[in-house]
UniProtKB/Swiss-Prot annotation:
Disruption phenotype: RNAi-mediated knockdown causes an increase in the number of germline cells in the mitotic zone, a lack of transition zone and a defect in pachytene progression resulting in a proximal gonad devoid of nuclei. Causes sterility. RNAi-mediated knockdown in adults decreases lifespan. RNAi-mediated knockdown of isoform b in lip-1 and puf-8 double mutant causes a decrease in number of germline tumors. RNAi-mediated knockdown causes a reduction in intestinal ilys-3 expression in response to M.nematophilum-mediated bacterial infection. GO terms for cellular component: cytoplasm; nucleus. This is Mitogen-activated protein kinase mpk-1. The TXY motif contains the threonine and tyrosine residues whose phosphorylation activates the MAP kinases. It comes from Caenorhabditis elegans. Residues 1-17, 24-56 have a biased composition (Polar residues). Keywords: ATP-binding, Cell cycle, Differentiation, Kinase, Magnesium, Meiosis, Metal-binding, Nucleotide-binding, Oogenesis, Phosphoprotein, Serine/threonine-protein kinase, Transferase. The gene is mpk-1.
Amino acid sequence: MPTWIPNNLCAQPTTRNAKPPSNGHPQATQQQSAPGSLAYRNSSNIPNGATNHVRQQKWQYTRSGHRKMADGEAVISTVNNVEEVHGQLFEVAPRYVNLSYIGEGAYGMVASALDTITRDRVAIKKISPFEHQTFCQRTLREIKILNRFKHENIINIQEIIRSETVDSLKDIYIVQCLMETDLYKLLKTQKLSNDHVCYFLYQILRGLKYIHSANVLHRDLKPSNLLLNTTCDLKICDFGLARVTDPQTDHTGFLTEYVATRWYRAPEIMLNSKGYTKSIDVWSVGCILAEMLSNRPLFPGKHYLDQLNLILAVVGSPSNADLQCIINDKARSYLISLPHKPKQPWARLYPGADPRALDLLDKMLTFNPHNRIDIEQALAHPYLEQYYDPGDEPVCEEPFTLEMEFDDLPKEKLKELIWEEAEAHHRRMEAEAAARNNGGQNPV
């Protein structure tokens, strides 16, 4: 396994021609002891992460504990336990202070903050979803899923800050562990060694095995949803588009509101094949693996047809058996009308890549979802043999059921459910804290 990432990983290209020592580990001039408890780390040294890139994101503080502003940065002010970040008010004090802007999306902003109890920096996601049903659905879905997930390769929820009553609920704050960067940012600046491609891929699949065992499809796997820290720990995030699926049910026509990033969509999603299965996530992981090998998206389609044509130009025209999986007559007719396209050799697309990585890539990016490799098979692939450990690849003990979906509920009801989930999380955290204080015994 890789025991380090050079200190300049996220600032300058790494040196790739240094020969590894006899134990198969890349030669390192600096190593650090492994924090954490992942059993698949069989060494006291673990990857050292994107150090310089992360250093550029560190914050400077005055002696009083207030953060210094960088040139051109929006001012962050604190009044009455409320901090302003890029025009957004974060009501998270007094526990969380010294906020720093990280990013924002359609209905929320993310900031880092200092937890005054643990003295750790955390990530706080402020979400204001209650004007739109779709945003409420995604918020509730993510909270329900992450409240029940507990896995080292999946982002956790440390705390949910909400109003005292559902009627006064306008915003919700989700506190999570702070991860210094993500795979998208990393690939924008650095070429990964094969060791790190392998290590990251294993962690993705390890987390996805847990997700799929819970009868959940992530549906939006992409580099920006894979968080990384300085020790190269990887965590899957953003479950707003995830869906519960029943392996015993025919999901023909399922996932009608699929809006995930086009570049990582499986072809069956665009072609309306018979049902949607866990294989859609496997396709996305294949696209991510290809991107780690080259720092370029494999299928950067500009629109629906362009996306499909880019896929066919690489994996080749579908066979007659593949076409039978497509129930949309227009889609099938379109594919039949296209000139035959041969499959491209992966070694030509990625010269110098580990042949085992390319073999796994080929099995992930198989056009027919019924012939695509599954997560358990991918974990057992020879490319990942140095990490593969079925005894340390846990599954979810309580899988989700279809009754836990809520597509047709009005936003007012969704708001109530969000508040109830936040309240349930708060009670569970209090019970766990009481149990710890009681010597591990359940509180009376």
